Regions:
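Bacterial N-terminal signal peptides
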Residues: 2-14
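Signal peptide processing junction and immediate N-terminal pro/mature segment
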Residues: 14-21
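Sequence context surrounding c-type heme c attachment/ligation sites in exported
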Residues: 21-53, 64-142
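A Trp-anchored, charged/polar loop motif used as the substrate-binding/catalytic surface
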Residues: 61
Length: 142
């Protein structure tokens, strides 16, 4: 959802004309606009696993490029996961990796109604991503 906030001052009172958020409800603000970030994958893909934690049609976006073999601190990687036939702009799952102080933080969200809620996070995600250590714990390659 794209946001525009317009405020008009009228005789010492403010009137909000339109308010919306640039983040889908429930997703962290640091993922704002992720669908406009460069994609890591060339085209949507369905390949998964084993084991398969993210089944569906996937696109992977990163806000920063690798520096050598590693992603820099502050990198956010978002994997949007839609089921076949669903709108890619409204994925039913969103997996997020965020690099802080040299370590990845993981969290996966599930669409529940009009809001994303936490599905999995932390060690559960990290144990699987350990298999991609050679690519800085990221399975998808450019």
């Amino acid at each position: 959802m794209v946001a525009i906030v317009i405020v008009a001052a009228v005789a010492s009172s403010a009137v909000v004309v339109a308010v919306a958020s640039t983040t889908a409800a429930g997703l962290p603000s640091y993922t704002n606009g992720y669908q406009k970030w460069p994609k890591i994958n060339k085209k949507p893909f369905t390949k998964c696993g084993p084991p398969c934690a993210h089944g569906g049609v996937k696109n992977v976006y990163a806000n920063k490029k690798k520096v050598g073999a590693r992603y820099p601190n502050g990198t956010v990687i978002v994997k949007s996961i839609a089921q076949a036939g669903d709108k890619p702009s409204r994925p039913n799952q969103v997996a997020v990796m965020r690099k802080v102080a040299g370590r990845w933080k993981y969290i996966e969200y599930q669409l529940s109604g009009s809001r994303y809620t936490v599905l999995a996070q932390g060690q559960l995600c990290q144990s699987c991503h350990a298999r991609a250590k050679a690519n800085d714990y990221v399975f998808t390659k450019r």
